[in-house]
């Protein structure tokens, strides 16, 4: 009986690793600068998905070793640059944004990651007219950063 229980527990832990679905997904950023005339919709990818976590509801110093809290975060990122239209000559119209290339499940590191619990609901709104068709900045410099 104990062997069956132990085997079931091991299989559940392994299934949690296999079912950790963390991958790049399509996302639309709405970007505007106060000095420019338009809001721009930029299509990119972000890391999103499920990562295995374990947080036992038992209190004690030995339990801290059992806590596994990982989130879906960037493993490799490429930064791209877009040019925002309708900006006066004294304003830099360029905007750089991340594109997720590969994602991974790991504990959040505040020195490297943006560790937020909930995104703002206002992030998907524009206060200026929206332009839906955006072209990359002609002289854009893409660079890849592996985290």
Swiss-Prot record:
Alphabetical list of SUPFAM superfamilies matching this protein: Cystine-knot cytokines (SSF57501)
Disulfide bonds: 22-72, 36-87, 39-126, 47-103, 51-105, 108-115
Primary location group: secreted
Annotated signal peptide: 1-20
Subcellular localization(s) per the UniProt record: Secreted
CDD domains recorded: GHB_like
Coiled-coil residues: none
Keywords: Disulfide bond, Glycoprotein, Hormone, Secreted, Signal
Domain of life the protein comes from: Eukaryota
GO cellular component: cytoplasm; extracellular space
Residues of this chain annotated as glycosylated in UniProt: 43
GO molecular function, one term: hormone activity
Biological process (GO), any one: G protein-coupled receptor signaling pathway
Function field: Indispensable for the control of thyroid structure and metabolism. May play some role in the biological processes of the immature fishes.
Summary of subunit composition and partner proteins: Heterodimer of a common alpha chain and a unique beta chain which confers biological specificity to thyrotropin, lutropin, follitropin and gonadotropin.
PANTHER family: GLYCOPROTEIN HORMONE BETA CHAIN (PTHR11515), THYROTROPIN SUBUNIT BETA (PTHR11515:SF5)
Similarity remark: Belongs to the glycoprotein hormones subunit beta family.
Protein name: Thyrotropin subunit beta
